[in-house]
């Protein structure tokens, strides 16, 4: 009798853990997908709403993380959407989802018709470059985002190098 109760409890615990992991992965993927959709709708407020209050955004080409939702919104989302009002962020292939972590390759393209936050004037040039991003989510929000891409190629396309 005790063995049957133990086996039932063990089976329920395993099912609960599996369901929890699956839900977590689906939630992480859904949050990141909605975030990318907000970028492509050029809605910086909505995109930033997917960030945790204390999000850490890391751009490998810059080398220094930006911390906090408002700082990431201003320094990344607003910066790019103001400088590239026709920006398109295209996910290539299916994202890799593992628990609360999501990673995917992408292509970012558009025309630089606006001024960059650092004061660099618009070049009027079209560009397209590839990269990859890794996201960590927590409680339905993006806790961290790390972007890796060919910054030199991007700057050359803009005529800045």
Region locations from a protein language model:
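Residue-level signal for alpha-helical context at structural boundaries
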Residues: 46, 53, 64-66, 73, ...
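Short, flexible active-site loop motifs that bind/organize anionic cofactors or intermediates
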Residues: 34-37, 62, 144
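Short, low-complexity N-terminal intrinsically disordered segments enriched in polar/charged residues
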Residues: 2-53, 161
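A short gly/proline-enriched turn/hairpin at secondary-structure junctions
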Residues: 50, 56-67, 80-84
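A beta-strand edge to alpha-helix "cap/lid" segment located at domain peripheries
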Residues: 8, 12, 17, 23, ...
